[in-house]
């Protein structure tokens, strides 16, 4: 019994020391010193070589150092752990992207999504790389799938709002942007999104001498079936409903500014 208690205490002390070294290493990396962070992580790995987050942090440090091949090699060793997470695949895919190999990056994100189908982060990265290649519809589809599976992950709303701002369906830029700002009520991204939404309002609501026009949505034909007619289930597209609401709200105004938007 005494021996078991001693072994248990030693194991607990080891893990506490490992976690302390890990925290110090992360702090060093955050302060721009990945090399010293790697030194501490190596010390920690000698105490607990099977604690995979240490190897992940080391791979991250090499990514910060722009030694992407080393980062990939380390991170791929973590695939074997049943309890590894989606961030491992995100790191590997991002490194391939930094190496100007988007095809491999997308392949890694897809592999990660098979294992972690509810990963908002992997759908985000997949969308960003697709967008950088000019595949805008695929990018938005990835962001929206990420929103569907991980609704509390704000970055997919952020990217979707940015893409829709340059489309004929700005209504979705407004909706996704507002949700993102609720999820991130402060910080640089909140400020950036506030400015984007304001620009959308300025370009989407135009006043003339005696009227106001609203343009947030491109009207498109909708398919109506006999069953829908018989059931009385014919609805206007959301964009059309949004435009009608904006038209009514802007009726008594003469300009778009912070004061009118807050009335």
Enumerate the language-model features and the residues they cover.
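Alpha-helical linker/edge segments of TPR/alpha-solenoid repeat scaffolds
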Residues: 64-69, 98-104, 170-174, 186, ...
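Alpha-helical segment of the N-proximal tetratricopeptide repeat
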Residues: 14-50, 57-60, 64-67
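TPR alpha-solenoid repeat register
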Residues: 54, 88, 122, 156, ...
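Short coil turns that delineate tetratricopeptide repeat
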Residues: 49, 83, 117, 151, ...
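Canonical positions in the second alpha-helix
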Residues: 43-44, 77-78, 111-112, 145-146, ...
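Canonical tetratricopeptide repeat
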Residues: 57-60, 87-91, 125, 159, ...
């Amino acid at each position: 019994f005494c021996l078991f208690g001693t072994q248990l205490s030693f194991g607990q002390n080891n893990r506490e020391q490992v976690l302390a070294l890990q925290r110090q290493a992360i702090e060093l990396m955050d302060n721009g010193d990945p090399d010293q962070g790697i030194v501490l992580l190596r010390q920690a790995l000698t105490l607990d070589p099977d604690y995979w987050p240490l190897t992940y942090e080391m791979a991250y440090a090499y990514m910060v150092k722009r030694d992407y091949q080393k980062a990939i090699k380390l991170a791929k060793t973590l695939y074997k752990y049943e309890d590894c997470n989606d961030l491992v695949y995100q790191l590997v895919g991002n490194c391939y992207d930094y190496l100007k190999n988007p095809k491999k990056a997308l392949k890694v994100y897809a592999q990660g999504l098979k294992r972690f189908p509810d990963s908002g982060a992997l759908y985000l990265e997949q969308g960003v790389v697709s967008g950088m290649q000019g595949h805008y519809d695929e990018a938005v589809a990835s962001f929206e799938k990420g929103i569907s599976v991980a609704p509390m992950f704000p970055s997919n709303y952020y990217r979707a709002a940015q893409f829709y701002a340059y489309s004929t369906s700005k209504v979705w830029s407004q909706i996704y942007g507002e949700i993102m700002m609720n999820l991130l009520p402060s910080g640089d991204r909140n400020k950036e999104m506030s400015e984007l939404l304001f620009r959308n309002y300025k370009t989407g609501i135009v006043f003339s001498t005696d009227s106001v026009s609203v343009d947030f949505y491109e009207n498109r034909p909708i398919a109506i079936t006999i069953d829908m007619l018989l059931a009385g289930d014919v609805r206007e597209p959301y964009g059309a409903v949004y435009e009608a609401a904006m038209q009514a709200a802007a009726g008594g105004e003469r300009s778009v500014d912070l004061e009118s938007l807050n009335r």
